[in-house]
Amino acid sequence: LVGQAKYVLRFFFEWGGGCLWPGNEDAYQDLGLGPYDLLDPCPLPLSVATLERCWRMAEWHDTSLNWDYPPEPGPWRQPECDRFNSAVAELLVTIRGELGTKFQVIDKQNEVAEDPDLDAYLADPKGFRRDR
């Protein structure tokens, strides 16, 4: 179809992974499995500066998880979540601008928020149990 992007990409951060993933058959066939921002060389026409931002954001995202026991609350307070969410939105605008019309980048990133049980967890990490 005229005007339709050839490649569809899904944008979201995955623990220990990147943020740009295939979203259609053309992307899988021509670009591989992804995450594209971690492949060397990256198959996408993104600047080195943008790729470095992707890497830094992925590392930052990984700090939101409680790596000792992932189902328990992560360490981020709401201000950190808000900063991350804003940075994600800015990065997505940059990526879309650099990739142009051959790519459709679908935002699949869920906003992060402070875990409502964080205070209870921090008060007694060893004895913590979720109520839900």
Region annotations inferred by a language model:
Residues 1-132:
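Intrinsic low-complexity, intrinsically disordered or marginally ordered coil/linker segments
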